[in-house]
Regions:
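A short, well-ordered alpha-helix in the C-terminal region of glycosyltransferases
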Residues: 302, 309, 316-331
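Conserved donor-binding/catalytic core segment of Leloir-type glycosyltransferases
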Residues: 3, 166-182, 188-191, 205
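Conserved acidic donor-binding segment of nucleotide-sugar-dependent glycosyltransferases
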Residues: 288-289, 293-300, 309-314
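Aromatic "clamp/platform" in nucleotide-sugar-dependent glycosyltransferases that forms part
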Residues: 256
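Short alpha-helical donor nucleotide-sugar binding micro-motif in glycosyltransferases
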Residues: 68, 235-236, 243-248
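Short hydrophobic beta-strand element within catalytic cores of glycosyltransferases
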Residues: 34, 273-276
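Short, structured helix-loop element that forms part of the nucleotide-activated donor/catalytic region
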Residues: 39-48, 203-228, 240
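Short, small-residue-biased leader/transition segments that mark boundaries at the very start
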Residues: 1, 6-8
Length: 352
């Protein structure tokens, strides 16, 4: 089987593709990953048992074409590979096009997306948000769910570190690069809207690289105004992220456009609920008040109301642990992913 990917950075989409490698190998496939360059995740594919070819010319459809036609089955990862899908549509090789993209990913690529797909192509997405983004430009495409699987980090032996952010208070964290669509400014405004006596009862942590100056400035101003309660950390190691998930009370994802935020899923692994924007893939899976909370309209005031409730009732969030774990096991566990991916591959290859 051949997997086509645009560059191989260490970010959500390639890491998720890595999780498909052992499943495909267990089905008897040899896995070859083809991308134009290595952005840092190449070793993850090799460790998972795949072969990897990086070649800048593989963006030229004819170059990837010959290899793809020799494969039993092709996974095309993300909407940026639309040209490859267009080239393979209508051929004899089964193609699974797996979408992880936000609405923001579409304007510059929409003209390359085929208007019709051949019988050999099936489209899958990591949830309703990613499907809605494609449906905004191709409403007639049939898109099925294929949510990524994450390992059960809570069952692993990792080096536990007391990160020191709790300070004996409920801790609410957000993790991810600082860009406008991630909505750090909305979270900052919500923290400012809290009554002072409520804000003082909690700690807030922002983790991520500063990609957007406006987002970073809003966090810097907040840490300057409330140095006892609001903290910023550029990056944490994988083990420190796991420690954070263990130590936090809950997570906050204020994104304006986010297909399926990985850190929210990591929180579920440790039984931690999140407060998320309706513009996240996670929102479509949450049962309000049972395994998380959803606010609407990118409204900091609505987020502040939910935050205040969570700060005043940390025991309520702690009691959601079982339901959060259930949500992970049902939708995001390696077992759930393997079951869905196997069924998708079998369905596609049976058509041959």
């Amino acid at each position: 089987t051949l997997s086509l990917h645009d560059a191989l950075p260490i970010s959500g989409a390639p890491i998720v593709l890595v999780s498909a490698v052992p499943v495909l190998r267990s089905m008897g496939y040899e896995v070859l990953v083809l991308g134009p360059s290595d952005g840092g995740s190449l070793h993850l594919f090799l460790d998972a048992g795949a072969s990897v070819i990086t070649r800048s010319s593989c963006r030229n459809v004819s170059d990837a074409w010959g290899m793809a036609l020799c494969a039993d089955f092709v996974i095309v990862n993300m909407v940026v590979m639309a040209r490859a899908v267009r080239a393979l549509s209508g051929t004899a090789v089964p193609v699974l096009w797996w979408l992880h993209d936000a609405f923001a990913g579409y304007p510059h690529i929409a003209h390359q997306i085929p208007t019709q797909l051949g019988e050999n192509v099936r489209v899958y997405s990591v949830g309703s948000h990613a499907a809605n983004a494609m449906h905004a430009v191709r409403p007639e495409f049939e898109i099925r769910p294929l949510i990524y699987g994450l390992p059960d980090y809570a069952a692993e032996n990792f080096v536990r570190t007391d990160l020191g952010y709790n300070r004996g208070r409920p801790l609410f964290a957000t993790v991810g690069s600082f860009e406008r669509r991630k909505g750090h400014d909305i979270f900052c405004k919500a923290i400012r809207l809290l009554p002072p006596e409520v804000r003082e009862k909690a700690s807030f942590l922002f983790v991520g690289q500063a990609a957007d100056k406006e987002m970073m400035d809003s966090v810097r101003a907040l840490t300057a105004d409330y140095p006892e309660n609001v903290f910023y950390c550029k990056r944490l190691t994988r083990d420190e992220i796991k420690s954070l998930m263990e130590q936090c009370t809950g997570l906050v994802c204020a994104s304006r456009d986010d297909p399926m935020p990985t850190f929210v899923t990591e929180g579920l692994i440790f039984g931690k609920p999140s407060i998320v924007s309706e513009h996240t893939g996670t929102a479509g899976l949450i049962s309000e008040g049972r395994n998380g909370f959803v606010y609407h309209d990118d409204d900091p005031q609505q987020l502040a109301v939910l935050l205040e409730h969570a700060i005043e009732h940390p025991e309520e969030l702690a009691s959601m642990r079982t339901e959060c774990r259930k949500m992970y096991e049902q939708y995001y566990s390696k077992e759930a992913f393997e079951q869905t991916l196997r069924a998708a591959v079998e369905d596609l290859t049976a058509k041959k």
